[in-house]
C-alpha cells in the first residue's frame, strides 16, 4: 500500500528490507480489523508479488510459455488467489467490504481475469497451429474473460461505495502498447478459429 512509501518518507530508517513484507499487516488491521488483518495482508502481499511479474498493460499471449506449462502455472496462481480473496470477502463485516473490494478483491480479480484471458488466447493460438478443435473452445474462453474485464470495471466504477470511485477504472489496458497509445476501447486480441473441415 502507498502508506509504506509515506512511512518511508516520514522516517526512512524505520523501514528496512525485512519490514516491507510485514508492513501490510498493520495497514490491513487498520482497514479490516484485527481478526482479518493477517489473511488480508497475506493476500495483498501475494497480489503485489504476482503483479510484479508483469504489468497488465504489457502482458500478452506471449508473456509466458504455453508449451512448457508456464502459462497454466501462473494463471492458476491467480485463480487460487482470487478464490482466497473472495472467500475472505464473504466473511467480512459489511462495513469493511467496500474497502476490501477496492484494495484487495478488485485488483486480484482483475489481474486473475486478465491472466485467464491471455492464457486462453495463448492456448487458442497454440492449438490452432495444430488444427485442433479445442482451439475454438479456448477462443470462447478468451471472449468471456474479455467481457468479464469490462464488467469488473463497471462494478468498480458504479458499485463500490455507491459509485464513489466512478471513473477510476476507465483507462484502456487491453491492447496497450505504449504510454501514449491512443485507442478508443480495449481490444480483444486476435483469435484463431479451426474450421470444421480442417479438424483432424
Predicted regions and their residues:
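Substrate-binding groove of N-acetylhexosamine-processing glycoside hydrolases
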Residues: 1-200
Amino acid at each position: 500500500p502507498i502508506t509504506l512509501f509515506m512511512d518511508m518518507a516520514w522516517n526512512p530508517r524505520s523501514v528496512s528490507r525485512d519490514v516491507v513484507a510485514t508492513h501490510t499487516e498493520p495497514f490491513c488491521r487498520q482497514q479490516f480489523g484485527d481478526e482479518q488483518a493477517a489473511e488480508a495482508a497475506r493476500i495483498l502481499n501475494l497480489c503485489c508479488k504476482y503483479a510484479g511479474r508483469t504489468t497488465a498493460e504489457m502482458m500478452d499471449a506471449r508473456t509466458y510459455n504455453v508449451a512448457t506449462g508456464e502459462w497454466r502455472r501462473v494463471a492458476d496462481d491467480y485463480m487460487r488467489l482470487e478464490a482466497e480473496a473472495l472467500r475472505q470477502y464473504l466473511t467480512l463485516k459489511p462495513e469493511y467490504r467496500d474497502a476490501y473490494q477496492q484494495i484487495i478483491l478488485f485488483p486480484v480479480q482483475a489481474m486473475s481475469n486478465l491472466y485467464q484471458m491471455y492464457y486462453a488466447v495463448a492456448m487458442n493460438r497454440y492449438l490452432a497451429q495444430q488444427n485442433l478443435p479445442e482451439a475454438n473452445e479456448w477462443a470462447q474462453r478468451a471472449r468471456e474473460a474479455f467481457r468479464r474485464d469490462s464488467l469488473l470495471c463497471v462494478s468498480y466504477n458504479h458499485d463500490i461505495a455507491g459509485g464513489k470511485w466512478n471513473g477510476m477504472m476507465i483507462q484502456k489496458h487491453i491492447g496497450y502498447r505504449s504510454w501514449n497509445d491512443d485507442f478508443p476501447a480495449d481490444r480483444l486480441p486476435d483469435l484463431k478459429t479451426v474450421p470444421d473441415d480442417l479438424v483432424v
